[in-house]
Amino acid sequence: MALWGGRFSQAADTRFKQFNDSLRFDYRLAEQDIVGSIGWSKALVSVGILTAEEQAKLEVALLALKAEVEADPEQILRSDAEDIHSWVEGKLIERVGDLGKKLHTGRSRNDQVATDLKLWCKQQGNLLLDSIHGLQTKLVATARQYQTTVLPGYTHLQRAQPVTFSHWALAYVEMLDRDYSRLQDALKRLNTSPLGSGALAGTAYAIDRQVLALDLGFDRATRNSLDSVSDRDHVIELMSSAALSMIHLSRFAEDLIFYASGEAGFIELSDKVTSGSSLMPQKKNPDALELIRGKTGRVAGALNGMLMTLKALPLAYNKDMQEDKEGLFDALDTWHDCLDMAQLVLEDLKVNEPVTKAAAMGGYSNATELADYLVAKGIPFREAHHIVGEAVVYAITQQKPLEDLSVAEFKQFNAVIADDVYPILSLESTLAKRQALGGVCAEQIAFALQQAEQHLSTRHK
């Protein structure tokens, strides 16, 4: 039976009921709805609606229902209840009779669902923090494993300057650290309780909402009932955090897809995260990474959909807000799955170090070193840049790397070039010169690893 039927003389059309009902997705809020109901029952004791004995009886029944839901959440979907609130109330009345009908006194589904959703977001957010931390930890371990492995660095997908595989992995640790911080900030902002805001104007009972908020694990109660029941900023913030983090994961996936390609051959992905072709027996496809990349659009699309749903909604609650859950649930589930899959990809990843080193030495990636050499000889950088560009063109025509040109050949471009140029052009010199904070010299890589390991080991959620 619907919770609102008294006003109506006709039953809802079955097509409308199917269109309107939300149990098929908001059943995921069952545990939070029960927890919120227990908190509300305690508040009703404080204003004389329930006796302590009645509250205790309700709490026992609700806790038993919660245990059943935890064991078999799918049971909820076998009901024809309109939503999770109706289902919980119906089950409660089955167990305790008319006493269960007193629980909703002073409460609206508007503040109830807002509370349920925030409780769910807090729970899921903490799980996501753990997953981000786990991936960061795996990236740092990978960086430690390949601390001295040279890798070509790219701009415009063209070889630019040599870096290390460690430096590459630590770049994603930095991105994920921002993701972690953003998610933490979002969780701090949403940690306010709307329960007791009623439908829109506040409850008519003198409930201490601050005590109620603390009892439910929130930092404080919300301050404005109109805003409380219509606020979905936390949904947008969590979906935005998910979308931006998925962009980072997509970049991670794309890098590794390229590195694993036959054209690069830098890494070998484990059989555990790849698949084959039904036609071509030689294929080893990076499906895990491609799915991470593909699912990024799904999460970004969910965010855009939610932004449009909330656009121009008048205060306070509107049924449009029922659309907040499916996109949020899917976005956070997808984000969580992709974080875990990225970690799995790294578990047995192998780097082909001879290939990465040879690639790092190719593509005239030491051209900037030659320009810096000329600057040290007193030539302005812009002029040095032009000279080196001409030297590179010449080396390409001769099918030689810069370091194989003779001094005589170098002097065609500028007379100051001498034998002391060759140590400057070596791969080792190129890496060693990047000594500023955040650079790729051995000392900076070691420092960055130590800092990352310390940061992750001492982090608190």
From Swiss-Prot:
Quote the catalytic activity from the record. Answer: 2-(N(omega)-L-arginino)succinate = fumarate + L-arginine
Q: Where in the cell is it found?
A: Cytoplasm
The molecular function terms of the Gene Ontology recorded here are: argininosuccinate lyase activity
Which of the seven top EC classes does this enzyme belong to? Answer: lyase
Question: Which pathway or pathways does this protein act in?
Answer: Amino-acid biosynthesis; L-arginine biosynthesis; L-arginine from L-ornithine and carbamoyl phosphate: step 3/3
Picking any one GO biological process from the record gives:
arginine biosynthetic process via ornithine
Which GO cellular component terms are attached?
Answer: cytosol
Q: Which UniProt keywords apply?
A: Amino-acid biosynthesis, Arginine biosynthesis, Cytoplasm, Lyase
- Return the InterPro entries for the record: Arg_succ_lyase_C (IPR029419), Argininosuccinate_lyase (IPR009049), Fumarase/histidase_N (IPR024083), Fumarate_lyase_CS (IPR020557), Fumarate_lyase_fam (IPR000362), Fumarate_lyase_N (IPR022761), L-Aspartase-like (IPR008948)
Q: Which Enzyme Commission numbers does its entry carry?
A: 4.3.2.1
The entry's family comment says:
Belongs to the lyase 1 family. Argininosuccinate lyase subfamily.
NCBIfam families noted in UniProt: argH, PRK12308.1
Q: Output this protein's name.
A: Argininosuccinate lyase
Q: Which organism is it from?
A: Tolumonas auensis (strain DSM 9187 / NBRC 110442 / TA 4)
Lineage in the entry? Answer: Bacteria, Pseudomonadati, Pseudomonadota, Gammaproteobacteria, Aeromonadales
